[in-house]
Amino acid sequence: MRSGVIAQKVGMTRVFTEAGEHIPVTVLKLGNCQVLGHRTKEKNGYVALQVGSGSRKTVYMPKAERGQFAAAKVEPKRKVEEFRVSEDALLPVGAEIQADHFVVGQFVDVTGTSTGKGFAGGMKRWNFGGLRATHGVSVSHRSIGSTGGRQDPGKTFKNKKMPGHMGVDRVTTLNLRVVQTDVERGLILVEGAVPGTKGGWIRVRDAVKKALPADAPKPGKFRLANGDAAAEAPAAEQEGA
């Protein structure tokens, strides 16, 4: 199980195939996505990679966080996430994960924060039908109607679908196909829509319900902290780490 990456949503566009068909794609940009630390079975009880992306000023950063980035010898990151990985998929601390970590044609799962809609009624939020247009109904055409209670149980149960705040939820979209990658600009183009607004942070990782392509780099494609060309970490080196 390989690590994922943290990207920012740039927006949507389309690309054309050789047959002339157009494919709607979402552009995701990797903002210097680097490995910050390891979570090991012996110390933490599970195996994971801590990954950071983006840039952040240290003026208002807590001292503990500054020390964490200093220990990893990387610039402070705006967004930090953990990705569960297998023991043979641990990447070196400080390594920068490249866009060709994912290969064209493979499927990925993306997770983001949905667009906020503010306070919404039952018809918009839950697709309720509303009340009748005539036959005595006035003013309340878009209300939700009865919430289902009477003397027994004498209350409205929790989690009842009602008007309220809509959006700003953690949403995962499964099985989006990678259409193109651009290593120089750090871009990943995936087919279809991705949750969230432009500039939102997106977690991208290998699809859980699809097989990993045979040509996908293992344990990953990355650039070393000293500026060496992108490379794949040897499995033997990772086992001894």
UniProtKB/Swiss-Prot annotation:
Tell me the GO BP annotations in alphabetical order: translation
Identify the InterPro entries for this entry.
Answer: Ribosomal_uL3, Ribosomal_uL3_bac/org-type, Ribosomal_uL3_CS, Transl_B-barrel_sf
Which UniProt keyword terms apply here? Methylation, Ribonucleoprotein, Ribosomal protein, RNA-binding, rRNA-binding
Q: Where is this region: Disordered?
A: 139-166, 214-241
- Where in the sequence does UniProt note compositional bias of the Low complexity kind? 229-241
Molecular functions per Gene Ontology = rRNA binding; structural constituent of ribosome
Question: Where on the chain is N5-methylglutamine found, per UniProt?
Answer: Q151
Question: Where is coiled-coil annotated?
Answer: none
The record describes its post-translational modification as:
Methylated, on either Lys-155 or Lys-158. Methylated by PrmB.
Its GO CC terms?
Answer: cytosolic large ribosomal subunit
Q: Which domain of life is it from?
A: Bacteria
Its function, per the record, reads: One of the primary rRNA binding proteins, it binds directly near the 3'-end of the 23S rRNA, where it nucleates assembly of the 50S subunit.
Q: Which PANTHER family match?
A: 50S RIBOSOMAL PROTEIN L3, LARGE RIBOSOMAL SUBUNIT PROTEIN UL3C
Q: How does it assemble?
A: Part of the 50S ribosomal subunit. Forms a cluster with proteins L14 and L19.
What does the similarity note say? Belongs to the universal ribosomal protein uL3 family.
What NCBIfam families does this protein's entry cite?
L3_bact
Supply the name of the protein.
Answer: Large ribosomal subunit protein uL3
